[in-house]
């Protein structure tokens, strides 16, 4: 239980988070803030980090390693058998053996997390501490749970999976900062997530990216007349989105070129908002007749105004524009990699094709984020798109016993 002092402090944080509106497309709407305000936010964020030191140390970033990896690599048919022999003979330690397993990283926003809107206290706690239990990284062996991408990959190979995603994460300029609310819940924007990966000695073999949904709040900062004619605004947002996405992606590619193992990067298009709004409208009707159903449905409208019915059409329109920018961006980057044999970048619309029109796929609390069934559908769709990248990396059902250096990390011994 919390001490009285900690409880009072956190209660104040919850009230602040509830009172202060969320800022989505910050670089378009936010004026420069006074220095004392910036310093106050910095101090408050550091205080929360100090209070939650146990959480920050224990789960930053959340990682899962195949539990029986040692038994699996000890099989002569394993591609990592030679690494296992080196470990048994004392040439490398256990940590180095784990580093030689395939590493997979996930970058994204709240749609890659077990996240939904609830009471401020519950939302804060879950955003800061709740990891796993999502379509990318779920380790629950219960057949009724999510069969995550991590678990599906385990059928082929032992691996290490790490999630860098965070609720509220944006595709924003690296110079924009993460903002106070995002720092409080320990969220990093795309550039910050990329920076985390770039700091690691062991660079991932496979990087999956699904982010941009928080960039869709196109009404933020616009007057009523401007909302009537948003064409210029939407195009500005799409153009800036591509610039801000390209910078961290290029940094990851540049690092990948220096690695002595193959690297595949998969950029996923945004969710199918057209089908999502069909389900949300059903939820709105049910909530109107019985407010206990989808109890936090209105919270989404308050913090993300573009979810409101008058603005949904242009939100869908913007999502398609951003998907087009990502597709074009990846195509250009792929052409630049023509002479690089160890880096592959791919755009996938697999997650954009998930049909969210069914009520059971959206969360029963806020009718905004995916439900458990929604996470199951996303896991199946995402995994179905990984075939070309897994083949490029040499990960698959028909792995042979011969060593595969493209999968092994050969650091200094």
Regions found by a protein language model. Give the residues of each.
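A short helix->loop->beta-strand "cap" motif at the edges of active sites that frequently abuts
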Residues: 256-263
């Amino acid at each position: 239980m919390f001490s009285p002092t900690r409880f009072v402090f956190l209660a104040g944080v919850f009230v602040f988070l509830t009172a202060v509106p969320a800022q989505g497309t910050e670089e378009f709407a936010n004026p420069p803030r006074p220095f004392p305000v910036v310093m106050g936010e910095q101090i408050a964020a550091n205080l929360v980090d100090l209070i939650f030191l146990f959480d920050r140390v224990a789960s930053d970033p959340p990682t899962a390693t195949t539990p029986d990896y040692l038994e699996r690599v000890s099989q002569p048919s394993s591609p990592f058998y030679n690494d296992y022999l080196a470990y048994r003979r004392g040439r490398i330690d256990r940590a180095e053996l784990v580093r030689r397993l395939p590493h997979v990283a996930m970058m994204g926003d709240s749609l890659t997390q077990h996240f939904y809107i609830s009471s401020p206290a519950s939302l804060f706690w879950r955003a800061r501490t709740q990891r796993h239990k999502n379509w990318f990284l779920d380790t629950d062996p219960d057949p009724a749970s999510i069969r995550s991408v991590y678990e599906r990959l385990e059928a082929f190979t032992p691996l290490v999976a790490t999630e860098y995603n965070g609720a509220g994460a944006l595709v924003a300029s690296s110079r924009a900062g993460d903002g106070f609310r995002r720092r409080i819940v320990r969220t990093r924007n795309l550039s910050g997530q990329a920076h985390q990966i770039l700091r690691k000695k062991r660079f991932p073999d496979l990087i999956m990216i699904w982010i941009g949904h928080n960039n869709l709040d196109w009404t933020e900062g616009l007057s009523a007349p401007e909302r009537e004619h948003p064409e210029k605004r939407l195009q500005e947002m799409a153009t800036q989105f591509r610039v801000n996405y390209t910078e961290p992606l290029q940094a990851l590619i540049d690092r990948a070129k220096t690695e002595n193992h193959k690297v595949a990067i998969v950029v996923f298009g945004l969710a199918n908002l057209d089908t999502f709004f069909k389900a949300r409208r059903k939820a709105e009707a049910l909530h109107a007749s019985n407010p206990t159903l989808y109890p936090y449905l209105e919270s989404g409208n308050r913090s993300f105004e573009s979810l409101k019915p008058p603005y949904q059409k242009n939100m869908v329109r913007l999502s398609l524009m951003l998907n087009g920018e990502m597709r074009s961006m990846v195509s250009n980057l792929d052409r630049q990699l023509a002479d690089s044999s160890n880096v592959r970048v791919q755009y996938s619309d697999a997650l954009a094709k998930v049909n969210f029109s069914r009520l059971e796929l959206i969360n029963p609390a806020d009718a905004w984020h995916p439900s458990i069934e929604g996470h199951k559908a996303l896991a199946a769709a995402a995994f179905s798109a990984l075939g070309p990248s897994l083949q490029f990396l040499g990960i698959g059902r028909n792995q042979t016993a011969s060593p595969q250096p493209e999968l092994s990390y050969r650091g200094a011994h």
